[in-house]
Amino acid sequence: MNLPAHQLTMTVLMTPDKTNFFGNVHGGDVLKLLDQVAYACASRYAGHHVVTLSVDQVTFKQPIHVGELLTFLASVNYTGTSSIEVGIKVISENILSRVVRHVNSCFLTMVAMDADRKPTAVPKFNPITPDETRRYEAAILRREMRKELEERFNKIRLSKT
């Protein structure tokens, strides 16, 4: 099988052990799955183990119900020297009614690590399709926004001391 190294799809059945007090799937369980999917996508692309640097724009659009299939559609959007932005779209499917819903989206930045647990270089991502190019350009903007936000937070921290 010839799977693209920059994409990954994973489907998981939502079981009763994942519910919150409202009977829906607990957001924390979804966050853990998002991190696992981002790890799998980024590490396969990089050929190295990775660690999570940041989780951006996690948007829970609709509740997820027990018994639904949750499909995670992950793709590498951008690479830095050692970092990889992975975008994930989450689709929920009701097995009985066949209703499919877009329930979550987010972006995770992962950093590739060498055997000495130091950041290591990753292959440059070169978008090919129009969708990949759009996601690549949006990832550059998000990266710039993260840097700007970090600078603002640092100014706030320094002014408090």
Placement of each model-derived feature along the sequence:
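Short secondary-structure boundary/capping segments within folded domains
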Residues: 1-2, 30
